[in-house]
A protein has these predicted regions:
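Membrane-interfacial terminal anchoring regions of lipid-handling membrane enzymes
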Residues: 1-71, 77-83, 88-97, 105-111, ...
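Flexible glycine/proline-enriched surface loops and loop-helix/loop-strand junctions
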Residues: 162-163
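Conserved nucleotide-cofactor-binding alpha/beta core module
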Residues: 100, 104-136
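Acidic beta-strand-to-loop metal/phosphate-binding motif
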Residues: 159
């Protein structure tokens, strides 16, 4: 099966105009007929993203992992596609097998996106349904599939909660852990099961978030009790901006597999959250946002010129925003500092 032939109309709809993605995919998609050939193109594509939209990319901690073992990577979530794509790329280059990616069913509404997601070892977490029974069935199937993958010595990546952390607060949802445990809850306690899965915490951080303005507008509305209505193509637009727009320095820090003692899902989620927050590597924009919002300076290792550059960047982003939206913009950048300090 040629992926281009399977959805020719959708192919013409790819929203990566005036950039490399459309040109690159135009010449390469014809050769895709299996996961391996896609992942070779995926490698080249991620390298182009890094070379053309990222100033510096680092991934630390992979030496703690065994290339012969499978893991459950639980990550914070800032960008719809790049969080997992960049880590998968780093693993691939370090000699590890690439992982399977858990994605929400909201990304399956556009056919070409759905096809590409599935081909790149992605599977759906079905969170919606006509009845509670339908939802439970979908979550049970996802739980069973995660177990099946790990049992076959294949790794899995999943975000620590549903959706991106648009407010900049990285927290692990206990309900996510209960969903993962669902399939084996009668055989193993939750701590036993998660120790068996070998949970690895992951923190990804971006100097510049291409979707920061949209996130600020949404958070300002919801925090004021107003309804935020997502447009039909909003997720697709976010994917395109996240891939093509400048991101500055990008860091991924990978922790060692966690050991759990408690059988309380809240305590397990707190342990994962703390690990991810400790791993998070702040950038100059995080400190600049704190200065803009709090008029205080926290200790950091960046030069004065770098901080001023970041302040200018944030001010340019905030120019088009209302007072409440500006504060949400700054907040999404500095929250990581508050949380690392235990706030």
């Amino acid at each position: 099966m040629c992926i281009r032939d399977s959805f020719p109309k959708a192919y013409a709809f790819i929203p990566f105009k005036n950039f490399f993605v459309r040109r690159f995919l135009s010449s390469k998609l014809r050769s895709i007929d299996n996961i391996e050939s896609y992942q070779k193109i995926f490698e080249n594509l991620v390298e182009k993203v890094i070379n053309q939209s990222i100033s510096s990319f680092t991934c630390n901690g992979l030496e703690q992992l065994d290339t012969n073992h499978s893991y459950l990577f639980i990550s914070n979530h800032r960008d719809i596609t790049l969080d997992s794509a960049l880590l998968n790329y780093a693993l691939y280059k370090a000699g590890h097998k690439t992982f399977n990616i858990a994605v929400g069913d909201n990304l399956m509404n556009t056919k070409w996106v759905a096809d590409l997601m599935r081909l790149n070892k992605s599977f759906i977490i079905q969170r919606s349904g006509a009845t509670k029974k339908d939802i439970y069935k979908g979550l049970s199937l996802a739980s069973e599939y995660i177990h099946e993958l790990i049992n076959k010595n294949e790794s899995v990546w999943i975000a620590q909660k549903q959706g991106r952390a648009k407010d900049g607060i990285d927290s692990t949802d206990p309900a996510l852990l209960k969903m993962i445990h669902l399939h084996k809850r009668k055989e193993f306690s939750i701590s036993e099961y998660f120790n068996e899965l070998k949970v690895v915490p992951v923190a990804v951080s971006y100097e510049y978030d291409p979707n920061d303005i949209n996130k600020a507008i949404e958070c300002a509305k919801t925090n004021q009790g107003k309804d935020y209505i997502k447009s039909s193509n909003e997720d697709i637009s976010s994917i395109a901006k996240g891939i093509t727009d400048k991101k500055g320095d990008v860091s991924i820090n990978v922790g060692s597999p966690l050991k759990f003692v408690s059988d309380d899902s809240d305590q397990i989620s707190d342990q994962i959250t703390k690990s991810i927050r400790n791993l998070y590597e702040p950038h100059s924009t995080n400190y600049a946002a704190y200065i803009k919002s709090k008029n205080e300076i926290l200790d950091h290792s960046f030069s004065e010129s770098k901080i001023n550059e970041s302040i200018n960047y944030l001010e340019s982003r905030a120019m088009q925003l209302t007072k409440h939206e500006k504060e949400e913009l700054y907040s999404q950048y500095y929250q990581c500092l508050i949380k690392k300090m235990g706030g």
